[in-house]
């Protein structure tokens, strides 16, 4: 081997070693970036109507941020507001405004509206009714109307299926469908799935469900989703407030959010989540033409 060739090989080896050193440094930097990214655990609890969307958002968010954990729990809007107020949850999911919940300091909570949801009265198919006036609906739920034949339906006794008192769905339905009047005594179910099952199995049953529950169209089988005053519960009718039984979906925090909580709320309102909001039967905030307090 000539002296010239030897010098060339030494130079080539030096270049290769230097490149290896820098490659190693780059690899270490990438690893450190992943380790020092967003991390921590939070809990979002409350509304079962919002839970399907919150569950999906949690999954997508943690896929993007593997160091973060978002635990989503139900329990109803009242439970969510109580838990975020006490600090046992970082986010309180609610169908109702915090000011409408007794026993908490609503002024300590920050409202984050993430979408809109509609609700509808539903009956067993055998009731043979597809539309009611608002006054008929109130009459049924307050116990003044006791048989479906009184509103043009079948000769079947009406059975009322209520939701638990902690339910934001119940509070919203009472406020906007029943004008604040309390329902008569009836059966009580604590979840949308239970309501669907009991209404389908009980001739003459009536209750109410979030429209997002029908993102799976098969769940409508065996049920009539009622028009009210001739107005159907559709996205178009809700965005213009033509159909009145709807509410904002709130994600309350105790004061200003930080860290994982803040990042998760930002993600909930991102363009990426908008398609999921629509797909799951909710309405993006930006699509609303009407507002309410």
Give residue spans per PLM region.
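Bacterial N-terminal signal peptides that target proteins for export
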Residues: 2-12
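Bacterial N-terminal signal peptides
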Residues: 12-20
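Exported/periplasmic ABC-transporter solute-binding proteins
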Residues: 3, 21, 26-78, 82-85, ...
């Amino acid at each position: 081997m000539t002296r010239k060739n030897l010098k060339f090989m030494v130079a080539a080896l030096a270049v290769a070693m230097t490149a290896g050193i820098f490659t190693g440094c780059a690899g270490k930097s990438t690893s450190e970036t992943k380790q020092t990214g967003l991390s921590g655990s939070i809990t979002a609890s409350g509304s079962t109507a919002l839970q399907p969307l919150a569950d999906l958002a949690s999954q997508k968010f943690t896929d993007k941020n593997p160091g973060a954990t978002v635990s989503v729990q139900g329990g109803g809007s009242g439970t969510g507001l109580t838990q975020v107020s006490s600090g046992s949850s970082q986010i309180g999911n609610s169908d109702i405004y915090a000011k409408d919940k007794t026993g908490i300091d609503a002024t300590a909570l920050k409202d984050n509206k993430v979408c809109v949801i509609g609700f509808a009265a539903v009956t067993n198919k055998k009731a043979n009714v597809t539309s009611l006036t608002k006054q008929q609906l109130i009459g049924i739920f307050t116990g003044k109307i006791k048989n479906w034949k009184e509103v043009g339906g079948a000769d079947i006794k009406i059975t009322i299926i209520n939701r638990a008192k902690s339910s934001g769905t119940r509070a919203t339905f009472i406020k906007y469908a029943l004008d604040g009047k309390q329902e008569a005594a009836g059966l009580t179910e604590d979840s949308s799935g239970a309501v669907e099952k009991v209404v389908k199995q009980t001739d003459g049953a009536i209750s109410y469900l979030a429209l997002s529950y029908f993102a799976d169209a098969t769940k409508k089988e065996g049920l009539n989703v009622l028009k009210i005053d001739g107005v159907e519960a559709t996205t178009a009718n809700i965005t213009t407030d033509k159909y009145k039984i709807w509410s904002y979906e709130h994600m309350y925090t105790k004061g200003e959010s930080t860290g994982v909580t803040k990042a998760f709320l930002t993600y909930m309102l991102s363009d990426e989540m908008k398609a999921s909001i629509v797909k799951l039967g909710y309405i993006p905030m930006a699509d609303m033409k009407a507002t309410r307090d």
